[in-house]
Every structure is written in structure tokens, then in C-alpha cells.
Amino acid sequence: LGALGVRNHQRTGWRETLDAEHFDSYRDGMAGCYKCPVHCRARNRLPSTPDNETSQDNWSHGDGPEYVTLGKFGPGLGIDQPEQVIRFNNMLNDLGLDSASTGSAIAWAMELYQRGLITAADTGGLELNWGDGKLIEDLLLLTVERSGFGDTLADSGKAVARGKYPPAALDYRMASKGLFQSDPHDARIIKAFALGLAVATRGMDHLRNRVTLEINARINDDPQFKRELYRGEVAAQPTDYEGKEHAVARCERVYASGDAVGMCRFNTWLFNS
């Protein structure tokens, strides 16, 4: 589909080095929530080798990464090595930072720096270059401490309103109701995703109503099944506009019902295939 947000959604395609099979060698078993039979949470462990320059510390092992963290801290920031994404993931979990909003805040800042809307004078001397793994680690530590430029990043999508960025920065912010887009897809490609994010009840949160099955080819090839699934005529192509309101409304109602009974979104009908 070419629908992956790269460098704050400036591009929609990235390198194959972050494909799923390249993470298999770092998997250290599976885990799950208490009494959940699915056990969908991968464990990771990074070896200490001269190639990846990974030291054995608290961030060399942990849970994940999931797709959102992979997208936000991989292509979203110009990173193409699995070891770096895994380490960022473990840092985020240890520091208690949300990977979606934090990754988006850093990507936004990097594009503003790229375009000259902010300079080293605004960042405390930091050069916000895409793909700089050491810089990203430093930014995470600064953010959690609200130290230096980390104070601006911690303001997240509200940095303009709080006087940290110029008003022109809003043209490069992927957010709704002050909340950054929570998934790494480029929603301009998948029209149902775009509509869902625009009307979501909690900012740009894909977990409220995302029509995940729009990217399932088998479902799109069966018009009758798709009609019954969403209770309305929905165009087969993810890039078409027709009928996507039926799919978004159906998903929002189903997900709200799942939330009401405490059901994990990944086990909720319509969210996963």
C-alpha cells in the first residue's frame, strides 16, 4: 500500500532491514498478561557484540517491540537497524514513556529542525538529524527529566500553544485534539483510517475505531462479506472513499463494547484479522 509514515510522514516507504524476520534472532520467548491464553507479547534480548555496540544494561532486554513502537522509532525517525529500535523500546518501557506520542514529538521536532523552523539555539545545541541513534537515546532521557530541550518534547503536541515552537510548526504536526497520531500508518493512503482518526473520541487515537481489516486483501476481494461485516456498502479498495463511514461507525461501536467489558483490543472482533 505504501502507507508507512517515514520521517514524520514525508515519505511512505522504508528499508527492508526492519521487516519482521530480522527481529527473530533477538526473540527471547513469549509472554502474556495474567491468565491470557494468547501470549502475544514477544520478549527480547540484545547480545553484546562489537557490531551493535550494545552494552548489557537494563535496556538490553525487555518486552516487545510492538508495531507502533517499531514504526514510530524506526522509519518515523529515520532508523533502519533492529537493534536500535529494540533498545529504544526497552528504554521507553523502563522510563514509562508512551512510544506513540514520544516518537511523534521527536519526529515533529526533527522535521522542524530540518526545515529551519527551529535551530540549535532552540534545542540547547543539539543537532536534530534523522537516524541519529545516540541523539534519540539522549532525547528520551531529557524528556523524562524535562531537562533542556526535553522540556519542549514533553509538551508534546501542545508545544506551539505553550510558546515553544512558532505557529508555522503546526503545519507539520500530525495530531487531532492535541493528541499525536498513535499509529505509524500514513492515513492519507487508507481512507477509512483517515476518517477514523479525524473523528476519534480521543484525539488521533487509532484504537478507538480503526478499520484494521482494510489492509486484509481477502476481505476486500469479497464484497458481500464486507457488506455484511460493516452493515453497509463499503468500497473494496483501501484508497477509495465510498462507504468508509459505515466501516468506521461499526468498528467504533464494537470497540466501545469491548472497552465496556474490559476486553483487550487485540482480542476484539474487527480489530484483528
Can you describe what each PLM-predicted range is?
Residues L1-S273:
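Extended C-terminal regions of large enzymes
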